Amino acid sequence: MERIVLKADLILHGRELDSMEKGSIVIENGRILDILPQHALADFPITDACELSFPGQTLMPGMIECHNHLCIDATLPEHLELLAWSNECQLTILALKGLEEDLLSGVTTARCLGDKYYIDTTMKKLIEDGKATGPRLLAAGTGMKGSHGAGYIGSPHCGTEEIRNTCRQNLKRGVDLLKLFVTPGVPDPTSSFVPSFLSLEEISMAVSE
């Protein structure tokens, strides 16, 4: 059993990034076991731990990725075009690989802003049940764009009732947030005009849901 204790003058932790002065992080076999004040280490049952001190430094145990799509791996050639022909099985394999890589890179929470086939909500449940490896996920389910909208991830919608239906299907799947693709992902740099592919009524419907 490998245990490492990291000590720093300040540690930010938890969902609200609470601050702890003179804190310590106890890691066991590559996983964070506990976060506690350094003075409490004497009462913590750890032996033969490797201690690393970072005086004058701040540690945040786990980075938060605020925007991702599990079905996209930007390291692959023509990664966006892959979405057009990849099936659910292929995208699931891609998501599992990416989730493990994210966790190993230091990401412990990721916000997924739309994925095909509800892969994000499926992965979230598998991770929570200990059946898959990855960071804690906040899932959006099916992203909604206009029927003439841009992008590869969002599902085309036309009218408030289609928006309402998808919102409710997403909520039934246990999403944490709803994602609207309102404007182009990459606006035209030569124009000051930014089009909206969803109407005010469609956006208002999603907000009301």
Task: Give the role of each language-model region.
Residues 5, 49-53, 139:
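Conserved beta-strand scaffold positions in the cores of enzyme catalytic domains, especially
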Residues 80-93, 148-165:
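Active-site mouth loops of central-metabolism enzymes
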Residues 9, 25, 30, 56, ...:
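Divalent metal-coordination and catalytic microenvironments
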Residues 1-45, 59:
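N-terminal metal-binding scaffold of metallo-dependent hydrolase/deaminase domains
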Residues 122, 161-209:
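Histidine/acidic residue-rich metal-binding segments in metalloenzymes
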Residues 94-119, 134-145, 175-189:
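Divalent metal-dependent hydrolysis catalytic cores, especially in the metallo-beta-lactamase
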